[in-house]
Every structure is written in C-alpha cells, then in structure tokens.
Swiss-Prot record:
InterPro entries: CALM/Myosin/TropC-like (IPR050230), EF-hand-dom_pair (IPR011992), EF_Hand_1_Ca_BS (IPR018247), EF_hand_dom (IPR002048). It comes from the Eukaryota. Ca(2+) 1 binds at D60, D62, S64, R66, E71. Keywords: Calcium, Metal-binding, Muscle protein, Repeat. SUPFAM superfamilies: EF-hand. This is Troponin C, isoform 3. Belongs to the troponin C family.
Length: 155
C-alpha cells in the first residue's frame, strides 16, 4: 500500500471496502475501471473526469482494465484526502475570520489562548503559554493566518 492510504481513517477504508464489494458482482476481488466513477458518485465524492481517467491509468499498473481493492483505495484516497484538506482549510479560515474582528489578518495571542482553552480544557496556563510562545515565534503578540494554519494542522 502507498503512503496515501495512511491518510485515510479506518472508517473511510471500511466505506470504500463496502462500496468496492457491492460493485464486485462476481467476487473476483477486482472491479472494472469504468465503475470507479459510479462508486465515487454514490459516495458523494466530487471528482474531475479527466483527472480520474489519468489516475485510473496510473493506478491500474497491470493495464487489466480492472482495479484490485488496493488500487481502488489508492485512487479514491487521492480524491478523499484532497477534499478533506480543502474543507479543513476553509473551516480554519472561517474560524480565523471570526476572531480577526478588525479584519487586519491577525488575531491577538490572548484570543488564541482562549481558542486553545476551548479546544482542550485540560491544558494548564503554563502549557498554554508555552504553546503561544512557539506559535508567536516573533513575539509580536499577534498570530497571522499562516501561523494559525500551521498550529492547527501541524504543517
């Protein structure tokens, strides 16, 4: 399995397995590549037809016109993970905007401290101060969106 499947949760893999099995009518352990679009559609997963065709070509290494489950997961993961990352960035941007009351692209570290406290009420004052210190590396007393994203996603 490639590193991309490691980004999927066990729940997502279970959903993919169910979808795969329901399209593997002969129980051969593989599905025709033309069924992949139907499966993604049924899962409510948006995709670009051209990108999907390119990915199928890339993932169907033996060029059999059929995908084994591992190949299918590898392909589906590319759509699911990307969608999640985009959705997460959008949600974080919205959250940041709520706290950026002046709309100047910064939030005060005092405000960030409150956010962190809400996210994890087990954190001590000292732990919060250490986190703030790491995030606000320039000591400006404010955090911009990039610093906020980095803190929230660890990237």
């Amino acid at each position: 399995m490639s590193s991309v499947d490691e980004d999927l949760t066990p729940e997502q893999i279970a959903v993919l397995q169910k979808a795969f099995n329901s399209f593997d009518h002969q129980k051969t352990g593989s599905i025709p590549t033309e069924m992949v679009a139907d499966i993604l559609r049924l899962m409510g997963q948006p995709f670009d037809k051209k990108i999907l065709e390119e990915l199928i070509e890339e993932v169907d290494e033996d060029k059999s016109g059929r995908l084994e489950f591992g190949e299918f997961v590898q392909l589906a993961a590319k759509f699911i993970v990307e969608e999640d990352a985009e959705a997460m960035q959008k949600e974080l941007r919205e959250a940041f905007r709520l706290y950026d009351k002046q709309g100047n692209g910064f939030i005060p570290t005092t405000c960030l401290k409150e956010i962190l406290k809400e996210l994890d009420d087990q954190l001590t004052e000292q732990e919060l101060d250490i986190m703030i210190e790491e995030i606000d590396s320039d000591g400006s007393g404010t955090v911009d969106f990039d610093e906020f994203m980095e803190m929230m996603t660890g990237e």
